[in-house]
Amino acid sequence: MRKTSGKQREGAGVSRQLQNIELPAPTFKAGGSLARALQRRRTIREIGDKALPLQTLSNLLWAACGVNRSKGPFGVTGRTAASASNSQEIDVYVALAQGAYLYEPLHHRLQAVASGDLRRLAISRGQAPAGAKAPVRLIFVADIDKLVHTSGFMEPGLRNPDVQRSYYYVDTGLIAANVYLFAACVGLAAWFHNCDKSALWAKLRLRDDQRVLFAQTIGYPASRQTAVRRQNARRRARV
């Protein structure tokens, strides 16, 4: 059984003010070929504030690290993103306007964690506020307990912090790459960046053996959003 810190127990009442979100089943109709997604993949920092439809958020999270097969290595489900010995040690937290959630791939839902808008904390101080109002920020958190206690396999030296870091940084990058490719497929903007690690660790009420690593911002490109607003304004003017 994994240890639970007092910090987590004290914060349980806060998350009750925020409701869990049951995500619709992911759909696979949108998008194009992998080659086209790779061609379009890029970092776009200028991101608008328009909210993503729940279906799009569902598809995004499944693409990031959702379950894609019931039987993976070492007796657990498989994910869209590989991880060291299928340890699945990277947790993805989702910061929305109303609060922060933990994505649960097995049940494909968002578990309420903390009320309030934490999106600004997911950008490091001094970073350009280009995407400050973007609708979604993913926060990547390494759970060392999952890495050390991988079912069915124990690599020599895995308790070495340097070895652990080499794994969880690579595994974070694999998830972030999936997000970039999904964004390229459906015309979204994505930006992988640093974040205020200590502030997020406290707000998310993480354990001592959990590490906040990076964040990734997703939304509609600001240029596209502005163009749509202008088009809608012209339509209203003609009515």
Predicted regions mapped to residue ranges:
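N-terminal amphipathic, basic helical "cap/leader" segment at the start of enzyme domains
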Residues: 2-136, 227, 234-239
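Generic beta-structure capping elements
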Residues: 26, 141-143, 221
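Short, flexible beta-strand-to-coil junctions
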Residues: 95-98, 142-144, 218
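Short, charged, solvent-exposed linker or helix-capping segments at domain edges/interfaces
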Residues: 149-152, 226-230
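A glycine-rich helix N-cap at a beta->alpha junction
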Residues: 204-228
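Surface-exposed, flexible loop/turn segments at secondary-structure boundaries
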Residues: 100, 108, 118, 146, ...
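Short, surface-exposed helix-loop/turn micro-motifs enriched in polar/charged residues
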Residues: 84, 191-192, 208
